[in-house]
């Protein structure tokens, strides 16, 4: 329903709430043309060209796309009109359609917020929390480089509490919807009574502006100059690491004078280089919250595993390893390089006496299968790299079939190894890279984990 403008009125608070710190198309605004024009004329709203054209070079002002291959034309009202294909899934941006924003500075008006989490941080977590609070006060960039299972979410809590009570808006941005769904209930439990929104495609909160936001990086395309403290979780994860439009979305959604925090167990080389050279403020947490060393991966040669799978056979070394752990009541993750190999492996395991399922990115029942695995209803879960992050299962043992495959980068292998040993009661466990020839990525991943364990022992972060 279009909301009309009242004669002789001041600005519309409803329109202000809709547009403040946002970057929206006309189709996303349920207000009359008269109202919008009045607010533009009186200086409350800016209407910015959606696409900038300079010497026949195009730039999308919503997603920042400048690659000319992403621009095309559609026919409307007898004309060919330019539009951006890069962000079209969020509503079509074209040369004749403006992006609207509210011009006034967004002032916070929420009540003081108290952390309701009653856990205790480890010394390493507390160190990171203190550095984060300092970075927020100084509006700095910060890298929190913490191993898988270090309790990265919990170490953010004191900094989030401090920021919210200064009237600063905080956003945790992550490349994956799965992570938003996992983090949202934890943050709502830790900050009971706070207004928290979870933003992802299809969410009820989509487009909301709240003091604490957990968002996919895609959803940030709808915001502009909104965030005081931007925390990028899994900065090295796909698709954020490979998509410049998502990196642009983060920068556009931040206020000009704001804090930017990178959170990762496996930071990209450029961030790592800057941190080690002192060009980027950083804090390194080399141990898990339970103070036990990271399980170090072992390499196990399994021959021509592809040939065996094509003959509907499981490599004997892999089969023996899985059967041993299943017999002992320990669940097993088996990572494979592709969906086609996953399907072959799943078919082969039908003849093995264990409760088995397989998952990949397009699996409609992925969420249910992962929950069954967590609940102990499955013995073996075969998966692609879609589950390399964010899944915690007690007592789980982790194997990689075809660890020499190019999909298994150093970062991916470190993340996969991080599935094992996350619980205090089950802090050790097996991590096996089954291979048909070692690769540099395999060696680098093992070296990475060994170095973290050595550093943790040196600074007395492990028992």
From Swiss-Prot:
Changing residue 234 to Q: 100-fold decrease in transformation efficiency. It is an enzyme of class 3 (hydrolase). The keyword Signal does not apply. It is found in: Cytoplasm. One of its GO terms (biological process) is DNA recombination. Keywords: ATP-binding, Competence, Cytoplasm, DNA-binding, Hydrolase, Metal-binding, Nucleotide-binding, Zinc. InterPro entries: DEAD/DEAH_box_helicase_dom (IPR011545), Helicase_ATP-bd (IPR014001), Helicase_C-like (IPR001650), P-loop_NTPase (IPR027417), PriA_helicase (IPR050880). Induction: Part of the comF operon, encoding comFA, comFB and comFC, transcribed in competence media (minimal salts plus glucose) once stationary phase is reached; transcription requires comA and degU. Expression activated by ComK. Residues 133-285 form the Helicase ATP-binding domain. Zn(2+) binds at residues 60, 63, 84, 87. May help stabilize the protein. Its cofactor is Zn(2+). SUPFAM superfamilies: P-loop containing nucleoside triphosphate hydrolases (SSF52540). The keyword Nucleotide-binding applies. ATP binds at residues 146-153. One of its GO terms (cellular component) is cytoplasm. A motif (DEAD box) lies at residues 233-236. Its main location: cytoplasm. Residues 317-463 form the Helicase C-terminal domain. Disruption phenotype: 1000-fold decrease in transformation efficiency. Cells take up DNA very poorly. Destabilization of ComGA. The 'deletion mutation' is an internal deletion of residues 29-143 that has no polar effect on expression of downstream genes. GO terms for molecular function: 3'-5' DNA helicase activity; ATP binding; ATP hydrolysis activity; nucleic acid binding. Monomer and dimer in solution. Interacts with DprA and ComFC; ComFA-ComFC form rings about 150 Angstroms in diameter with apparent 6-fold symmetry. Involved in transformation (genetic competence for DNA uptake). Required for DNA uptake but not for DNA binding to cells. DNA uptake is energy dependent, this protein may provide the driving force for DNA uptake. Does not have helicase activity, translocates on single-stranded (ss)DNA in a 5'-3' direction in an ATP-dependent manner, but does not unwind double-stranded (ds)DNA. ATP hydrolysis causes the release of ssDNA from ComFA. A ssDNA-stimulated ATPase; dsDNA does not stimulate ATPase. ATP hydrolysis causes the release of ssDNA from ComFA. Belongs to the DEAD box helicase family. This is Competence protein ComFA. It comes from Bacillus subtilis (strain 168).
């Amino acid at each position: 329903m279009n909301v009309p403008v009242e004669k002789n009125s001041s600005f519309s608070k409803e329109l202000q709430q809709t547009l403040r710190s946002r970057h929206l198309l006309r189709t996303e605004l349920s207000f009359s043309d008269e109202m919008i024009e009045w607010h533009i004329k009186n200086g409350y709203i800016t209407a910015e060209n959606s696409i900038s054209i300079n010497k026949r070079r195009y730039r999308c002002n919503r997603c920042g796309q400048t690659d000319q291959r992403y621009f095309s034309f559609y026919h409307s009202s007898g004309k060919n009109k330019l539009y951006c294909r890069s962000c079209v899934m969020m509503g079509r941006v074209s040369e004749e359609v403006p992006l609207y924003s509210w011009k006034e500075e967004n002032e916070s008006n929420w009540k003081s917020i108290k952390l309701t989490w009653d856990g205790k941080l480890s010394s390493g977590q507390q160190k990171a929390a203190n550095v984060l609070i300092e970075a927020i006060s100084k509006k700095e960039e910060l890298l929190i480089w913490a191993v898988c299972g270090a309790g990265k979410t919990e170490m953010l809590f004191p900094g989030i509490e401090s920021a919210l009570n200064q009237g600063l808006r905080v956003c945790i941005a992550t490349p994956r919807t799965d992570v938003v769904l996992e983090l949202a209930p934890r943050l709502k439990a830790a900050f009971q009574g706070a207004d928290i929104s979870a933003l992802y495609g299809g969410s009820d909160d989509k487009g909301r502006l709240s003091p604490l936001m957990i968002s996919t990086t895609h959803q940030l395309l709808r915001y502009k100059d909104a965030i005081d403290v931007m925390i990028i979780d899994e900065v090295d994860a796909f698709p954020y690491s490979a998509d410049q439009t998502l990196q642009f979305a983060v920068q556009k959604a931040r206020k000009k004078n704001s804090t930017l925090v990178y959170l990762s167990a496996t930071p990209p080389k450029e961030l790592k280089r800057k941190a080690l050279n002192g060009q980027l403020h950083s804090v390194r947490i080399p141990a898990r919250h339970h103070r036990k060393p990271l399980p170090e991966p072992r390499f196990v040669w399994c021959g021509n595993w592809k040939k065996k799978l094509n003959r509907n056979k499981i490599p004997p070394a892999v089969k023996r390893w899985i059967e041993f752990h299943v017999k002992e009541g320990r669940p097993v993750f088996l990572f494979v390089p592709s969906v086609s190999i996953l399907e072959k492996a799943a078919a082969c395991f039908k003849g093995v006496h264990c409760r088995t399922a397989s998952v990949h990115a397009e699996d409609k029942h992925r969420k249910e299968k992962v929950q069954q695995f967590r609940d102990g209803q499955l013995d073996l879960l075969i998966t692609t790299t879609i589950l390399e992050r964010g899944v915690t299962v007690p007592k789980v043992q982790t194997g990689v079939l075809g660890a020499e495959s190019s999909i298994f980068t150093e970062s991916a292998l470190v993340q996969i190894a991080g599935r094992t040993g996350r619980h205090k009661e089950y802090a050790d466990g097996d991590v096996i890279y089954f291979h048909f020839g070692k690769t540099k990525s395999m060696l680098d991943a093992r070296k990475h984990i060994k170095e973290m364990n050595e550093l943790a022992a040196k600074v007395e972060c492990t028992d």
